[in-house]
Amino acid sequence: MLPVCVDADQALRCSVLWRPWSLSPTEARGHKTLAGGVRSARPSGGVFHHPVRLFLPRSRMQEYLSRLGSSVLASFPVQATLHFYNDEDSSSEEEEDEEHANTRCRLWRP
């Protein structure tokens, strides 16, 4: 588990570890403990529901991964998965794939 710290430099010095099964005192107020230690949560509007996915355009993938990605993920308060989507016209890619498939078929014919 990674420590809950903003900077990577502080991560090694930070003493509090984030554990998804441990509730902070603020979160614990919104839960009831039932028999057997089972917790019941009341719904709240501002809570993230896992899995959290951040959808980013493929055309800016290099920019996000090199420069902005670390700041985006550092400012996002929960674990998230990055998903890149195609935001450009993919017709040229489809034509290239068809040409490549035709070439491959021609190469493997006896």
UniProtKB/Swiss-Prot annotation:
Stretches the record annotates as Ripply homology domain: 50-85
InterPro entries per UniProt: Ripply_fam
Region Disordered, residue ranges: 87-110
GO molecular function ontology, one term from the record: transcription corepressor activity
Subcellular location(s) of the protein: Nucleus
Domain commentary: The Ripply homology domain and the WRPW motif are both necessary for its transcriptional corepressor activity on the transcription activator TBX1.
Protein name, per record: Protein ripply3
Source taxonomy: Eukaryota, Metazoa, Chordata, Craniata, Vertebrata
Gene name per UniProt: ripply3
